[in-house]
Amino acid sequence: MFEGWNKGWENWGGNQQFDYLEPYADFDLERIAAYAREKGVQLWMHNETGGNIPEYEAVLEAAMRRYAELGVHTLKTGYAGGFKGGYLHHSQYGVQHYQRVVETAAKYRIMLDVHEPIKETGIRRTWPNMMTREGARGMEWNAWSEGNSAEYLTTLPFVRMLSGPMDYTPGIFDIDYSTAKADKGRIEWNGPNAECCIKTTLARQIANWVIIYSPLQMAADLIENYEGHPAFRFFRDFDADCDWSKALQGEIGDYIVVARRAKDRHFLGAGTDEKARTLVQKLDFLEPGVTYTATIYADAPDAGRNPEAYLIGKRAVTARDTIRIEMAERGGQAITFIPAEK
């Protein structure tokens, strides 16, 4: 996914006026789209409106048509800030706009990931291209504020997730921002003394891919923070197209354990609050009679004070087995269960 590709970002924070068809001179949209098709890679387009609805609707049809022509069939929209004219997101004006976007996107076979959305209404049952939405305080808040606590992340599944999928954009590996803080743009954005960081362990960041369900998932960190990282294997093995889910254990604001299945693979995600915790979990959600290779992404013993410390282990398991889930403060654990080769 690319954000900031289109002209108009120089007005951000003021009178937002974006061009949803014209890229900046140094961003060759057609060439990038052609290269993606050649490599079999699907692109995500991004449309930030800044709440300027009349401007967006004036080119909505043309923009969707153009994206489809380029082979782009996934679009993330954004509505940061209030709507122009003083309308609220949940006003009749706002709701009608969101409906118009969903229907227009469906016409061009484009899936939507809506940020700053209205509440889940069940519209995805009628318009299944409405794949996921933000609708709560997401990962991005860790970039400029006190961030999202581990307790918040053990509350979110019991509240926000009741209404449907959420695009939280989990999966950050640069937990203490040691890489990001050295970036000139980051210093200009946050200031030289900012204490922004991720408030969980790395293992919990991986577990959130399972806990916070979205059929469109995004590894949201910088590419260089993933390159050569052993834990990135989880994202390669994960299948977001889950056809079965179950909450296995949990207490609101304290801890949670979730299992999901996609085809013949199962995934488990567990997370705790600011308290270290050990849980015992039966694996009876697995297919009986099948032996799985469980790849476990866990907190290292010192993860409470070194949140990027993690362990990766493997073991053979069946539905008759039980596992211990050991989590550090603000920690978690993620497991992939892949049928063993016969």
PLM regions and their residue ranges:
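Solvent-exposed beta-strand/loop surfaces of large extracellular or lumenal domains
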Residues: 296-320
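Aromatic- and carboxylate-enriched substrate-binding clefts and catalytic-loop regions
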Residues: 3-195
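Beta-strand-rich interaction surfaces with strong enrichment in secreted/lumenal proteins
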Residues: 245-248, 257-258, 312-314, 322-325
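Solvent-exposed beta-hairpin/edge-strand motifs
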Residues: 286-300
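C-terminal beta-strand-rich structural cap/linker in extracellular carbohydrate-active enzymes
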Residues: 314-342
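Carbohydrate-binding surface patches
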Residues: 251-288, 333-334
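Conserved, mostly hydrophobic/aromatic
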Residues: 112, 211, 268
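Catalytic cores of secreted or luminal carbohydrate-active enzymes
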Residues: 203-247
